[in-house]
Curated annotation (Swiss-Prot):
Keywords: Hydrolase. GO terms for biological process: epigenetic regulation of gene expression. This is Uncharacterized protein slr0245. It comes from the Bacteria. It comes from Synechocystis sp. (strain ATCC 27184 / PCC 6803 / Kazusa). Putative deacetylase.
Length: 304
């Protein structure tokens, strides 16, 4: 079984008619998951209600000033944090619900020993302490990592980020903590321009794997076998979080890599050596057919 944490509320973060990070991303994925082989082994659940006690966990990663700014911008009818990152009237509440969904994913894995896919938006891995950027408002995975360390039995958390763009926000929000380990495979050079191989974190707890444009499944397979898996084996995490972006697909309009959907199943298969019960959550991926198929392929090794 795999738990899918999803709510139609995530569709209420409005980005405009031409923005690639659109509500249709989630509906395309949800439709594909409900039709996939083994769909009866997917357990759909809604995130818990958002209450005041979520704030202390968000504030581990974001400043109160930024949260106030984001809430006010939404309250005043919306606007944008930068040229790429719109905020609609519902965006603040939806972003908080996305955080809640990720924390529910952590709880589910620890309590039920069952893998989770958090089907939520807006994405988060570019958001830094004092602002959102790159389509991201709150850094869901970084908040989830810090939250996980408050749970009994969790001493070390690993984050794997396979989005085609480096998770600059995630790295910045976790690299000071020697109990959180961050590994990113990403096209380089590419937005946001961070993630050089020499950036290792304050405690040697970061592994950046910059890949040249045009990399295919063979390139990713070699990266997993020679870099990702040795790093994670050494970490021996009590919990594995995955920033699952799908914009390294060959058909994605925002980058220049050459993965096919089946390559994501290969990556999941490798990860199961480290943890059979990961928390995966959606980041990027903007070509709807390949996005939906890639999520299906991601989950197949966890079901069969």
């Amino acid at each position: 079984m795999v738990a899918i944490i999803y709510s139609a509320e995530f569709l209420r973060h409005e980005t405009g008619p031409t923005h690639p990070e659109c509500p249709a991303r989630l509906t395309a994925i949800a439709t594909a998951l409900r039709k996939m082989p083994g769909a009866n082994y997917l357990h759909w659940q809604k995130p818990s209600p958002v209450t005041w006690n979520l704030d202390p966990y968000i504030l581990r990663c974001h400043s109160q000033e930024y949260l106030n700014k984001l809430a006010k911008l939404a309250e005043l009818g919306g606007g944008s944090l930068d040229a790429d990152t719109p905020v609609s009237p519902q965006s603040y509440d939806v972003a908080r619900l996305a955080v809640r969904a990720w924390l529910d994913g952590v709880d589910h894995v620890l309590n039920q020993r069952e893998a989770v896919f958090v089907l939520a938006r807006p994405p988060g891995h570019h958001a830094i302490r004092n602002t959102g950027m790159g389509f991201c408002l709150l850094n869901n995975v970084a908040i989830a990592a810090h939250y996980a360390l408050t749970r009994p039995g969790v001493e070390r958390v690993a984050i794997l980020d396979w989005d085609v763009h480096h998770g600059n926000g995630t790295e910045a929000l976790v690299d000071h903590n020697p109990r959180i380990f961050y590994c990113s495979l990403h096209q380089f050079p590419c937005y946001p321009g961070t993630g050089a191989a020499g950036d290792r974190g304050q405690h040697d707890n970061v592994l950046n794997i910059p890949l040249k444009p045009g990399g295919d499944g063979k390139v990713y397979r070699e990266a997993f076998e020679h870099k990702v898996l040795p790093f994670l084996r050494q970490v021996k995490p009590d919990l594995l979080l995955v920033s699952a972006g799908y914009d390294a697909n060959h058909s994605d309009p925002l980058a220049y890599m050459n993965l096919i959907p089946e390559d994501y199943g290969m990556m999941t298969h490798y990860l199961m050596e480290i943890s059979p019960y990961p928390v995966l959550g959606l980041e990027g991926g903007y070509h709807l057919p390949s996005l939906a198929k890639s999520v299906v392929e991601t989950l197949k090794p966890l079901l069969f």
